[in-house]
Amino acid sequence: MENIQNAVIGEKEISKATEILRKYKQGKLNLEQKIISNEEFFKLRQWDHMTGGESDPKPASAWLFNCIISKHSDAMDSFPEANMLPRAEDDKAEAEMLSSVLPVVLEQNDFETTYSDVAYYTLKNGGGVYGVFWDGSKHNGLGDISIKKIDFINLFWESGITDIQRSTHLFNTEFVSNELLEQQYPELKGKLGQSTITLAKYLYDDTVDISNKSLVIDWYYHKMVNGVKVLHYCKYVNNTVLFATENEPEKYPNGWYDHAQYPFVVQRLFPVEGSICGYGYIDIARDTQEMIDHLNSSILKNAMVNARPRYMVKNGAAINEEEYADLTKDFIHVEANSVNDDSIRAVETTGLPSIYVSVRDGLINEMKECTGNRDVANGGTTSGVTAASAIATMMEQSGKISRDSNKAFYVAFRKVVNQCIELIRQFYDIPRQFRITGEMGTQQYVEYSNAGLKPMAQEPIMGQDMGLRLPVFDIEVTAQKASSYTKMAQNELALQFYNLGFFNPQMADQALACLKAMDFAHKNDVMQTIEQNGTLLQQLQQMQQIAIGLAQQYDPAFAQQLILMAQQSGQPLPQQQSGSAEVSGGEHPYVEKAREDAQSVADPDR
């Protein structure tokens, strides 16, 4: 812990920061209440927030739950991957290496699980947060990137903004065991007690005890130093500073992270003004879900009343009511001459008209339409549609809302990758080993450091020093896991190209002209392959001309063999107009041309 007397950040600064934290907490009370209530809806506990009789049935239907898990499956079907594109020719090799190394870093962080958790959180509450940190304890002290899901309840920012990077201060909080804190910071013994800040809590299924835990606060803030924005960081508990970058200026001259951004990335589902968190599917459809459940309750109550007949028994009627109500009794005892139609009578009930069931079904359809969770998106079909291609097309068309949401997720993923690159630039000074996937799926073992990401000297222009250049990359995000429909369409397109002869080197020019007017995934790769095939064909034809010309000059019999081999290889000779040209009755025109070319090569002055 820093020397408190000479520290820039001390108890006074911590008290001011805590007051700012309280102000930020007050500004997001409504958001916290919404998140806690949404979690109860997701757990099918909506009746805890709805009115109803004590004895009334309380069915909790899962239509809203089904919507969320359906949207989540769409998000995971389009799990993203990043491809780094250089902005300068000199950075091409570094971009290719980053494109191979970063997926390994994400995999080591179990990013797919984190992406899934943040997607669920975003779909439920309208927003989610990634935390992108440098964890110096990883790899036995070597350190590495750590990516975590952050809960809005534990994060505090300036109210009224829509970009978290514009917040003056930022606080991330977490309850940590007192025993663990005292082991890590021995100077805290006897100083840990009840925190002055209380956090909103979910309605957990388990009993969560935080009596032996203390609230640890990570405080991030910006300062301008010589006209440059610098990110500073302070960790404290109660009024005790555990760490502060401003207290160690020699070690942290550029602040906590060189990129000077808050290490948090926020994504929104349906944006709303004045908040970094938007609206989720529970916010949109919870009222409809409540009405569906109320109608279900009334329908079930009516069904139960009609399914179990009740009787009115006149006072004084000599009927054994217990035997009458017990269906296992074959005999019911009554007084002689005491039973008639007036003694006992069934209570007449009225069945529920079908209009109410239709209203309930209409509400269900309303929810499906408003959330874009139609039956066809989950594999269902409308009557009369049986063709597989038609079903696949309908499923693809019904997923446009999910594709729009995935685009928002990709924007956040791009920011996460960008922060990862900046952390690699700052901390990967020591080379480390990676197993990457090379061309054709082969495994390669490479050594990588940040040497190619550091500022580089530029070549002088007319003797003028141009200073340093920082390698910068554009990040292209694509779906790593495409849906079955997308894969099928892509494969069918490739087969169509093959059947149409696009990969035939003789048709390279026509194929390239056609592809320039098309738009599909990996178009540039296909065009590059076709162009290479055409170039190889031209080179092969030139070599054939030279070989046949030389053979005709020194060994005419062998020249004819070369001509036949060229014809049998499936590659037509350039001057041959028909595959049935005669070569025995006279000199083949191709041989004639080959001889002329060979002679011109051997004797340029001829």
Model-predicted segments: where are they?
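Residue-level "hotspot" positions that anchor or transmit function at local structural transition points
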Residues: 236, 256-258, 263, 325-326, ...
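Sequence/fold signature of self-assembling virion shell proteins
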Residues: 217-222, 228-230, 242-244, 251-254, ...
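Generic detector of bulky aromatic hydrophobic side chains
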Residues: 104, 158, 264, 529-532
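Extended, helix-rich architectural segments
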Residues: 1-253, 307, 323, 351, ...
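C-terminal anchoring/interaction modules
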Residues: 1-52, 122, 130, 139-140, ...
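A broad, low-specificity signal for short, low-complexity segments enriched in glycine/proline
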Residues: 88-95, 192-196, 253-256, 270-274, ...
